[in-house]
Each structure stands twice: as C-alpha cells, then as structure tokens.
Amino acid sequence: MRRAVAGGVLIAVALLNSACSSDGMGAAPTAVSTDPATTALAAAVDIRATGCRPAEVRGAGALIDGDHILTAAHVVAGADSITVRSASPDATAVTARVVAIDPLRDLALLDVERGELTELRPLHVAAGAVGAGGDTGSVVLFRDGAAVGVPYSIGRRVVVNILDIHHEHEVSRPGYEVDIAIAAGDSGAVMVAANRRAIGVLYAKSRAVDTRAFASDTGAVDALVAAASAVDPAVGIDTGECV
C-alpha cells in the first residue's frame, strides 16, 4: 500500500500484485429506483490503473449524467492503462480513458467506448456541498472484486487544507467529513444520496478515527464535464505525473 499524509488525512490506494451518448451506456429506463443503496450499485464501477507502479492501483467510481465516470484523480493520474467494470458479478473489464482531471479537488472523469457498460444507470451530479451533518446515503466499495453497498453518514461539511495530489501546492478542498470505514482501494467511491444524486467522492481515510473519511464535494464536476466536451474520448488527455 502507498500512503501520503497531508492536512491531517491519510490518502490510501491499493497496490495489487499483477497476477458517451444518449444511445450509449447512459440510456435510462422509464422507471428507476431512487433508493441510495440501489442507485449507487447500478452506477458503480471498479477501477484498475497501471503504469505508475509494478502493481495495479485500485479505486472505485460511478457513472454520472453525460456518460462520464466520476472518480478520484489520484487513482488514475499518470496511468498508462485504465480498465473499469461494473458491479455485476459477471461483468468484464473495459478500457477507459481520462477526459478531465482536477488535481486540486482530486477529481477526474473517465470515458469508455460507446456501447460499453450499458448496464449502468447514471447518477445526477449535485452542485456544490449540498449535504449536511446527519445526512445519510450509500457508497459502493469493492472487496475481492465483489461490490458491497455501504451506508454513510455525513459528520459535517468541511474545507480541508491539504496538498494537491502531486504534493506541490497547498489547497483548500471543500467537501465532507464522513462517518464510514474505508480501506485501500476505496478512493473514488461516489457518495449517493436520495433521488440518484452524487454528492461527493471519497479520497482519504482519517488518520485519527478509523471509521471516518474525507470526500470532495461535487461543485467542480460541472467544470470537468465542460472540459471533457472538448476532448476526443478515444484519445483522452495527458494526466500528468504519477502520484
């Protein structure tokens, strides 16, 4: 496991031994559940990235409106190859490319080929820090390749002073202190609230409390979506150096 400590939080990613359009994956059925546990599972993906270490880096993410996969930037920064797969037990991995990245907020968007991951159902992105202390919802974490829905509770809204993902500049990152136990490989998991709303992205475990984590809010996602609109999803972008 690789860890980086900054601003009182512990960023952890797992190192594993190596062994978008309306007619694409975002086409929603006429009736869908709005329960957070159900909608989180229907949008979740397991992410594997290679190229920065001898072993894979593992993370999580979720499909959002616009057929983009939302995740944490430090999971995919510098990667030569990225694959994603849905939470379905029989799902196969497909290639993904980074189309937008924000190293300050620790957020990234991925795209896959049109027609892939058609089983996913997108989440709506909430603007800004819409959650409040006591709010609850669900995230999907992957354990030994299996998707597990885990409830969360927001402890409070926070602005964390932390280094960017490349440890070059201190930034103020708005988001949430979240009551949830996470482990290596959970970075990028998307917090899902009622009515299919994505409200945050987990990026770090608390150093002080095992059952506490930190998440960026989704206030910067609209800007990432706008940036991605100018990118060829078949090519992607340069994601910078490994972290």
What does each of the following model-derived ranges do?
Residues 1-9:
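Bacterial N-terminal signal peptides that target proteins for export
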Residues 16-19:
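C-terminal motif of bacterial Sec signal peptides marking the signal peptidase cleavage site
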Residues 21-23:
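Bacterial signal peptide processing site
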Residues 28-33, 44-66, 72, 92-95, ...:
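A conserved glycine-rich beta-strand in the N-terminal activation segment of trypsin-fold
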Residues 35, 98-100, 179-182:
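Short Gly/Pro-enriched turn/cap motifs at secondary-structure boundaries
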Residues 39-50, 113-121, 148-242:
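Active-site region of chymotrypsin-like
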Residues 63-65, 98-100, 141, 156-158, ...:
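A residue-level detector for short acidic-glycine micro-motifs
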Residues 67-149:
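Conserved active-site neighborhood of the chymotrypsin/trypsin-like protease fold
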